[in-house]
Amino acid sequence: MDRTPIIAALTALSLAACSRPLRVVVGSKNFTEQVVLGEIVAQQIERTLHVPVERKLDLGGTLLAHQALVQGDIDLYPEYTGTALTAVLKLPPPQQGAGDAAAVFATVSAAYLRQWRLVWLRPLGFNNTFAMIVRGETARAEHLATLSEAARAHPWRMGAGYEFRQRPDGLDGLLRTYHLRTEGDPVSMDLGLLYAALGSRRVDLIAANSTDGLASAMDVTVLDDDRHYFPPYQCAVVARQDTLARFPNLRETLEALSGKISDARMRQLNYEVDGRHRPAAEVAAEFLRTLVR
């Protein structure tokens, strides 16, 4: 039997496999924190594994980023447990809202692996929950500290990001839980415009994020979610299982970041970009340098 054709075919397949670009594609959603985290992850891979990294940052909202990961357009991106639970898996939040962060993480980890062969790595260390924010002068004048107190006060001119209006853990459920009244329809806008709208008095109450850098730079008050409506939103890198298999040291490389970013640290990183207008890549590089001191 002439084995030459078989050997030639196997050789061609082997050469084709070897010629495939060995790279990791890092994605992110389309707001500052995600782009900063995408850069941190990308640079961590580059400096540790020394493999090429393609960046597909600023992809869009949650469902677009998730679909890109499932389809293999990207290899990994940072996600939040509460977002995965409610917006992606369509599961109800824990009855106690803020609930057990470890239980929510276990639920989304198991479901992602079972349904899509996606792996949740250990959390980065911070919890970016939604934050309902008013101007500081408003909170002081009306003696507001909680969402329940805001609900009893008066109807609110409200601003929110586009995704928050559509999410099961978003606007509609919040209004029902607190019997919060709005003055007209809430104004939808990009997340980066919320604080400007609040400062210019276009709106009086915004649905923002607890790790927003601008929150610490302005005179604002974050109203306490006293009915624990929002679930935990621990942030972690989610990766394709086949990508982790192709790069045996990738998981260890990324989990070296686990627990390294506190709420306050993430807020500061965001402020460096949004408040001081520094490039996300520069802020990410500076952060990584502090880890090796």
Each language-model region and where it sits:
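N-terminal export leaders
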Residues: 2-7
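C-terminal motif of bacterial Sec signal peptides marking the signal peptidase cleavage site
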Residues: 16-17
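Short, polar/charged alpha-helical segment
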Residues: 32-52, 172-176
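Short helix-initiation/N-cap motifs at beta->coil->alpha
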Residues: 54-67, 184-196
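The structured alpha-helical core of multi-pass membrane proteins
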Residues: 62-64, 68, 73, 78, ...
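Hydrophobic residues within well-ordered alpha-helices
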Residues: 69-70, 150, 197-199
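Contiguous mixed-secondary-structure segments that line small-molecule binding/active-site clefts
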Residues: 81-176, 180-189, 204, 209-267, ...
